[in-house]
Amino acid sequence: RFPEGDAPHRFDFSKNHILSSVDGILKRLNTEYLDILLLHRPDPLVEPEEVAEAFEALKASGKVKNFGVSNMSAAQIKLLSAYCSDPLIVNQLELSLKRIDWLEQGVLVNQKAGTDINFADGIIEHCRLEDIQIQAWAPLAYGMYSGREMENVTEADLQTKDLVQKMANEKGTST
């Protein structure tokens, strides 16, 4: 955790904030460039022109090689992409065996059972069409499937955890 003075307190995709954030990241990591920079969570007040200017400056300076986003909808990605000369190559989304809204959103079309799905409609398809990689965050459900003790675990969760462990053992890997 960063000291309180250095911690981000809001979503800010202004050019100045992006540029200064990258400089801080490079300094903390003691490196000259980032392979990829993700804009984390949408900034509802984004000025896409400013993001594009920041990306162009970072690319030209060699500080960032590629760009992506995290937790953005197809519409939000389209907005940024319309202004950025470099393609967005990643969208990081919460995907796991516990969080399957991404799957249900695609198969429970016109079904009452799908009314409580909390996943951006069409994001998987949009990313596939635009060659944007989906990067999973929390793929082991915050440790639920890798041995972390969790509260409010269902019987289905425990069965899934056992199955994940069994598959890992069969493959000679860890969870």
Regions picked out by a protein language model, each given a short descriptive name:
Residues 8, 24, 41, 67, ...:
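Short, flexible active-site loop motifs that bind/organize anionic cofactors or intermediates
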Residues 3-17, 40, 45, 112, ...:
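Active-site mouth loops of central-metabolism enzymes
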Residues 46-175:
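Beta/alpha (TIM)-barrel catalytic core signal, keyed to glycine-rich beta->alpha loops juxtaposed to Asp/Glu
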Residues 1-9, 33-38, 144-145:
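N-terminal small/glycine-rich loop or linker at the start of catalytic domains
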Residues 26-47:
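Active-site groove signature of glycoside hydrolases
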Residues 11-29, 50, 75-79, 119:
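Short, acidic/polar
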